[in-house]
């Protein structure tokens, strides 16, 4: 149950573009607080796994696809409070503004040379100001937010599983103890679907 709750999130489309949009939304919010107005450029640095899974993913409700569009949409109009559903709440005019940035070549995607399999960094610039954000290890685990180079949030050296949320399970923990046999044994011998807290599965079915 802890793994399901940790690994499953409601998202607009695939989780990887959602994580990119969330990171960009955090960076965009930081930019606006620093004094930037209309987004001029967006740079995304991500791990190979994120790029592989997000590069050609479509964005529901639009004709757009790819992490460049996800980043632009998040940066221009995203509110990070919506987490991986952030693109659901961006108005049409801001969607079009984001698309114009991509078409003008103002959104760059680069490979981040990092050990993490899940890593997204977004830098947004406007009016001489910058906003920067980093998501790492888990799709909604924001570990860094900066306004003009000054950190307003810095959890880069914090273990997400030790940050106070008992439901968080890191990929390393999953790899350490999860096997096909342990999943089978849990489902056939321990899981009680009528009483165990499996709300995330019910939400997934409803979606």
Q: What would you call each of these model-derived segments?
A:
Residues 1-9, 17-18, 22, 101-103:
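Short, Gly/Pro- and small/polar-rich lid/capping loops
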Residues 1-12, 179-186:
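Generic N-terminal amphipathic, Lys/Arg-enriched alpha-helix
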Residues 8-17, 190, 194:
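Short, N-terminal intrinsically disordered low-complexity segments that are rich in Pro/Gly
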Residues 12-17, 60-64, 88:
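Active-site nucleophile and cofactor-binding loops and adjacent substrate-binding regions
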Residues 17-35:
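Alpha-helical support elements that line or immediately flank enzyme active sites
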Residues 34-41, 82-87, 108-110, 194-198:
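Flexible, glycine/charged-enriched surface loops at secondary-structure junctions
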Residues 41-82, 95-107:
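A structural-propensity feature for long, helix-poor, extended segments
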Residues 103-207:
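Signature of multi-pass transmembrane helix bundles
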């Amino acid at each position: 149950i802890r793994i399901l709750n940790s690994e499953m999130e409601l998202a607009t489309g695939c989780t990887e573009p959602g994580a990119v949009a969330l990171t960009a939304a955090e960076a965009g919010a930081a930019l606006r607080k620093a004094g930037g107005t209309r987004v001029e450029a967006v740079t995304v640095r991500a791990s190979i796994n994120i790029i592989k899974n997000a590069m050609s993913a479509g964005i529901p409700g639009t004709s757009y696809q790819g992490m460049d569009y996800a980043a632009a949409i998040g940066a221009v109009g995203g509110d990070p409070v919506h987490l991986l559903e952030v693109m659901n709440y961006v108005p049409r005019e801001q969607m079009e503004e984001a698309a114009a940035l991509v078409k003008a070549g103002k959104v760059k995607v680069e490979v981040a040379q990092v050990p993490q399999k899940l890593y997204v960094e977004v830098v947004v610039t406007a009016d001489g100001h910058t906003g920067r954000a980093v998501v790492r290890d888990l799709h909604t685990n924001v570990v860094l937010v900066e306004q003009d180079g000054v950190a307003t949030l810095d959890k880069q050296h914090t273990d997400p599983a030790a940050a106070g949320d008992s439901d968080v399970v890191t990929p390393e923990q999953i790899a350490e103890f999860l096997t096909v046999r342990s999943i089978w044994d849990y489902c056939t011998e321990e899981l009680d679907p009528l009483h165990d807290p499996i709300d995330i599965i019910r939400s997934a079915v409803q979606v």
